[in-house]
């Protein structure tokens, strides 16, 4: 599947409804942080984390926490001030640590 063809729904179908809610929340944080960003190919930057999340969910089969961390990573990367605005307990320490660790290598 081409990165430009990937939808959030293609990712969500791999998870249970309660898991989907957290993925959607983290996706919307990333979408907001990336709304004005475009890639070198002039496509919306949100395509990149969608592509990574698709690989994580559909090809590797990692748990929903990893998918949420992919989107949270991009949200924090482009808007570091967002982390303190997220309600306490919304994301587990595991998800936050994965996202912050990804920021170290991005």
List PLM regions with ranges:
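Active-site helical microenvironments for divalent-metal-assisted chemistry
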Residues: 1-106
């Amino acid at each position: 599947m081409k990165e430009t063809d990937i939808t959030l729904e293609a990712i969500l179908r791999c998870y249970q409804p309660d898991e989907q809610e957290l993925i959607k929340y983290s996706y919307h944080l990333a979408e907001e942080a990336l709304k004005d960003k475009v890639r070198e190919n002039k496509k919306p930057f949100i395509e990149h984390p969608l592509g990574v999340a698709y690989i994580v969910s559909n090809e590797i089969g990692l748990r929903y926490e990893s998918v949420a961390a992919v989107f949270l990573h991009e949200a924090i990367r482009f808007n570091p001030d967002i982390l303190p605005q997220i309600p306490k307990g919304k994301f587990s320490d595991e998800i936050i640590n994965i996202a912050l660790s990804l920021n170290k290598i991005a």
